[in-house]
């Protein structure tokens, strides 16, 4: 009887975790309000190909993929987590990071093609292929070419 109970608990745990990692398409209007505002402000001319909710065990994130291949990922509260496109809007790049990159690396028409932020700071990729890592105080931590 104990073996059966342990087996049932294990099965429930496995299926619960599997179900917790659930992706589903949603309407843009179902995104958090902050995410909708962000899209209207910075990507108003971009056509959305797909919006989806990525549900994990404890929270959700949202991905918006554009017809031109660009993508924005949002946290559950609607704050942007990652922006990937041909030319990331400069207004979302912290000024110290943008100033550093334009002064030192973004000459001859290079653009920011990806920015990602998390609790440790920012990861930025420019169109030349170089990647930069900054801490939360916008200090350069690493360069990868």
Q: Where are the regions that the model predicts?
A:
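Interaction-mediating elements
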Residues: 21-145
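Bacterial Sec-dependent N-terminal signal peptides
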Residues: 1-23, 39
């Amino acid at each position: 009887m104990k073996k059966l109970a342990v087996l049932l608990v294990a099965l429930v745990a496995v299926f619960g975790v599997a179900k917790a990692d659930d992706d589903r398409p949603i309407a843009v209007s179902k995104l958090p309000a902050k995410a909708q505002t962000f899209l209207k402000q910075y990507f108003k001319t971009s056509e959305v190909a797909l919006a989806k909710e990525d549900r994990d065990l404890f929270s959700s994130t949202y991905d918006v993929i554009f017809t031109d291949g660009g993508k924005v990922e949002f946290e559950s509260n609607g704050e942007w987590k990652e922006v990937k496109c041909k030319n990331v809007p400069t207004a979302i790049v912290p000024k110290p990071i943008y100033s550093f990159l334009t002064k030192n690396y973004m000459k001859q028409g290079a653009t920011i093609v990806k920015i990602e932020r998390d609790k440790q700071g920012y990861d930025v990729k420019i169109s030349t292929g170089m990647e930069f890592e900054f801490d939360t105080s916008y200090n350069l931590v690493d360069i990868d070419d």
